[in-house]
Every structure is written in C-alpha cells, then in structure tokens.
Amino acid sequence: MKIMVAMSGGVDSTMTAKILKEAGHEIEGCYMKLHQKPGYHEENIRKVKKVGEYLGIKVHILDLQDKFNEFVYDPFVRLYKEGKTPNPCALCNRFIKLGALLNFAKQNGCEKLATGHYVQIIDGFVTMAKDPSKDQSYFLAQVPKEVLKDVIFPLGDKFKADIKELAREVPVLNEFATQPESSEICFVEDTYIEILNKHYNTNLPGNVVDKNGNVIGRHQGYMHYTIGKRRGFEVFGAHEPHFVLKINADKNEIVVGSKDDLAQKIVELENVNLFIDEDEFECETKIRYRSPKLEASVKIDKQNKTAVVALSQNALGVAQGQLCVMYDGERVIASGFIK
C-alpha cells in the first residue's frame, strides 16, 4: 500500500515511517511548513531529509502557512482577543494534518495518511492509545468521521518508552535524538502572550469586579487571564484567594470569586462533531486535555451542531473556546467547543 507519512524529524514520525516501511508498504514522507518561527523549519527540514535518506524514501516539503494562518493561528489570536481560551491543536488536526495534508497525500496517489499520533482507530472510532500517558484522542475529536478510513496511527497500540528504545537503534536519530519532547503549542515559544503582543497591546490595566459588578481590584490587561487563574491581579484587602470566573473583553474587565463560584454542572457546546447517530446519551466527558473524565448526560441539537452537557458533578475552570470531548469507554463519540 502507498502511504504518506507526516514527518517532523522527531522520533515518533520517524519511527512511524520506519515501522510502515518494514511492514512492506511504499512510503513517502511529507514535512509541513505551518508557521513562521525563525529558524524552526530549516533545522527540521535538515532532519527530515536525513531521515528520508536513511529510510530510502521520497520526502515532500509542503507549505501550508496560509491555510494554517486561516484555520489555526488567526482563530487562536482572535479567540484570546474575545476573552476565550482557544484549542489550536484540535483545529490543526482537523483542518491541516488530517485535512490539507490528507488531500495532498491523495493527490500524490497515496491510499492512506499516517501520523505519529498516539491514538487508535477501532471499528471506525477514534480510540484512546494503549499508552495512557501519551494518549491524543482528545485532540483528534474534531476530525470528521468520514476521514478516519483514510488515516492510520501505527504508534497507537505501542508505548512511548518502547518507541524510544527502538529509536536508539536508528543511527540517524541518534544524531539529534537529544531534542526535548515536543509538547504544548508548536508556534508558541514561551507563553501565548508573546504571540498576542505581536498583534495587540495586551498591557491594558482594567477593573477586577465581583459577581455583582462591584469594582474590587485591578488587573494588567484581560488577555493575560484565563478562567480559573488566581494570580496576576490585585483584589483590594483580600485575605483569601480569588479565581477568574469570567472575562468581559468588551469592558477590559475580569470577574473574580471563590473556588466554589468556579463550579459548573451545565456546559453548552458549539461546532459539535458526532461519531454516533444518537442525539441523547450518557457518557464520560473531558472539559480539557488533562482533566479527569466526568460522567454526563448529553443532548445534541444536530441541526445547529450544538449540545448541552449536564455533568454528574461540578467541574472547575470550564473555559469558553476549550474542547469538550465525550467518551464511551475508550472511544470518542462526540466533541464540541465550550461556548
């Protein structure tokens, strides 16, 4: 089978290509230029080309910067401006990696696209990886169901520690295998504020108010805060911690309260992506990547692609713009963005 492999020059994508080639498939690699971080692509392309030579495969360089800006970067900046907390990786997987790159793979005669994600496809469902510490099912929950037949994830049934061990036997990787584990958002060097500062003045001091709208303190600019944050603002004469409950971007104002005030049982979603036919069901949900699963009852409005999630217990720090993912056991059955 002819398979296109998304390649970054890192351990996971290299081992993905190696595993598939050793299984007898015809492999081509593709490196995606997604953003304009200085020096980032030159080093990665050098690595990818070395890996390509080692494996004896053709490597494509695909410039997707315009598409990445449209579907990932610009919404990231816009949502923070609106006082929300975006999830760029979920959008990138949907529109770029398993969108634009998949189209490129098909145009080049490939039957499948493979990536180094730690996730499985079982019975047509995105399913949690065998290695729970590396599971990326959450970030693939917005990928359309019809795409899943065209993608494979060879690392989904493997443990990261085993992949690292196998990688030690690959001489080309040993030259640059000391690179840190890639995590967080690829185009953010240190903090998201650095990105926003390129577009806006984020240092706009404003009022901190309580739930009733009374001014009780000052903050350094609303874009510095996300729901649940408890530092970086002043509450006059406060002796107990205060948490950000809401961000009123239009007023440059943050609403704060106690930890109990953060608690929420009803979560409304938009841009819902469904993997099942039912519009009412019981499930477990994650309101952000690292949060524990909570039992919930869900009602979907298919026409408007919205949902109401009733949690069985209070969740803290439910943030607009974050992805809520619904699971039946280990399989993803739906997802939507918190509104």
Swiss-Prot record:
Predominant subcellular localization, coarse grouping: cytoplasm
GO biological process: tRNA wobble position uridine thiolation
Residues that coordinate or bind ATP: 6-13, 32, 116
Disulfide bond residue pairs: 92-186
InterPro entries given in the database record: MnmA-like, MnmA-like_C, MnmA-like_central, MnmA-like_central_sf, Rossmann-like_a/b/a_fold
Record's keyword annotation contains Magnesium: no
Active site: 92 (nucleophile), 186 (cysteine persulfide intermediate)
Domain of life: Bacteria
Cellular compartments per GO CC: cytoplasm
Interaction with tRNA: annotated segments: 134-136, 288-289
EC number: 2.8.1.13
Entry GO MF terms: ATP binding; tRNA binding; tRNA-uridine 2-sulfurtransferase activity
Keywords tagged on the record: ATP-binding, Cytoplasm, Disulfide bond, Nucleotide-binding, RNA-binding, Transferase, tRNA processing, tRNA-binding
UniProt-annotated site: Interaction with tRNA, residues: 117, 322
Record SUPFAM superfamilies: Adenine nucleotide alpha hydrolases-like
Catalysed reaction equations from the record: S-sulfanyl-L-cysteinyl-[protein] + uridine(34) in tRNA + AH2 + ATP = 2-thiouridine(34) in tRNA + L-cysteinyl-[protein] + A + AMP + diphosphate + H(+)
Protein's cellular compartments: Cytoplasm
Family the UniProt entry places it in: Belongs to the MnmA/TRMU family.
Function: Catalyzes the 2-thiolation of uridine at the wobble position (U34) of tRNA, leading to the formation of s(2)U34.
PANTHER family for the chain: MITOCHONDRIAL TRNA-SPECIFIC 2-THIOURIDYLASE 1, TRNA 5-METHYLAMINOMETHYL-2-THIOURIDYLATE -METHYLTRANSFERASE
NCBIfam families: PRK00143.1, trmU
Protein name, entry field: tRNA-specific 2-thiouridylase MnmA
Classification lineage: Bacteria, Pseudomonadati, Campylobacterota, Epsilonproteobacteria, Campylobacterales
Gene (name only): mnmA
